[in-house]
Amino acid sequence: MLVLGIESSCDETGLALYDTEAGLLSHALHSQIAMHRDYGGVVPELASRDHIRRVLPLLQQVLDEAGRSRADIDAIAFTQGPGLAGALLVGASVANALGFALNVPMVGVHHLEGHLLSPLLTREPPPFPFIALLVSGGHTQLMEVKGIGDYTLLGETLDDAAGEAFDKTAKLLGLGYPGGPEVSRLAEFGTPGAFDLPRPMLHSGNLDFSFAGLKTAVLTQTRKLANTCEQDRANLARAFVDAIVDVLAAKSFAALKQTGHKRLVVAGGVGANRQLRERLNQLGKQRKIDVYYPDLAFCTDNGAMIALAGAMRLQAAPDLAQHSYGYGVTPRWDLADIRLPSAA
């Protein structure tokens, strides 16, 4: 089965072709970072208009790279939510038009389910069950994953997500957009321990997160350093990243201990952070836990993860198109709420 995946939830237009026997055949991505940089963040109307311009040329690109035609497509998966409503509607509209024209099934995919399953695109994919640390944009969650569509929420952020804290800290430090990678790069030059920042909810006794207080602590430090030199900024960035990593690592391994699972999957944009990967790998080696990550190319939003998630859903429930969530979009959508028809 050849599945076309379409991702358009925010500021990346991603398309991919995934074959259930041969694996990922091709993928293409256009990022809008340069367009939004002058505004310091994503402008929804501009994002939607750019998706419209990019989606069909990218479709032709993935078909050409895979040596396939539109007639070869057996099913279409698109990001149904969560995300920006206008941006989501672009992908959903293209999926609908192609689906009806080709008379093939369509399936709406949860954006975070795509991230959660993205490590399965690697050469050594993790088997079920596992614990997933999802750190993507406005989401920071710990999920117990027993199989496709079988997800239990163990913990989540009570205020700012880790990605949001990165972006806000970048602004406080006078860094560019997007903030996360800029903070991580600056932190590489920082001295560990130069600043003492809090580890919110580190000893809360549950698996929830909170990063608003950490952001406030960074704000307090920047105000104390009115004439901040470059090394001070690097040291503060390092202290911030270390605090985030400490909390994410501690909560992840607490979830593993609580459930008894021996596999940890890390997905989403922050999952590309080098310091986080090093800490989790170190703890995994010490505690005999296997840690899995997506390829760096698939940490950001992409069509490959949507094609894979759609293919896995259609394989698990062949009549899914008849039991679909509908062909609209769901800008607000909890991952723990989705189920396969047989599990509903």
UniProtKB/Swiss-Prot annotation:
Catalyses which reaction(s): L-threonylcarbamoyladenylate + adenosine(37) in tRNA = N(6)-L-threonylcarbamoyladenosine(37) in tRNA + AMP + H(+)
Gene Ontology MF terms: iron ion binding; N(6)-L-threonylcarbamoyladenine synthase activity
E.C. number: 2.3.1.234
CDD domains per the UniProt record, alphabetical: ASKHA_NBD_TsaD_bac
Keywords, in A-Z order: Acyltransferase, Cytoplasm, Iron, Metal-binding, Transferase, tRNA processing
Binding residue positions for Fe cation: 111, 115, 301
GO biological process entries: tRNA threonylcarbamoyladenosine modification
Cofactor binding note of this UniProt entry: Binds 1 Fe(2+) ion per subunit.
Superkingdom of this protein's organism: Bacteria
Main localization category: cytoplasm
Binding site residues for substrate: 134-138, 167, 180, 273
InterPro entries according to UniProt: ATPase_NBD, Gcp-like_dom, KAE1/TsaD, TsaD
Locations listed in the record: Cytoplasm
Transmembrane segments: none
Gene Ontology annotations for the cellular component aspect, listed alphabetically: cytoplasm
CC cofactor: Fe(2+)
NCBIfam families referenced in this protein's UniProt entry, alphabetically: gcp_kae1, T6A_TsaD_YgjD
Family: Belongs to the KAE1 / TsaD family.
Record's function text: Required for the formation of a threonylcarbamoyl group on adenosine at position 37 (t(6)A37) in tRNAs that read codons beginning with adenine. Is involved in the transfer of the threonylcarbamoyl moiety of threonylcarbamoyl-AMP (TC-AMP) to the N6 group of A37, together with TsaE and TsaB. TsaD likely plays a direct catalytic role in this reaction.
Protein name per Swiss-Prot or TrEMBL: tRNA N6-adenosine threonylcarbamoyltransferase
Gene label: tsaD
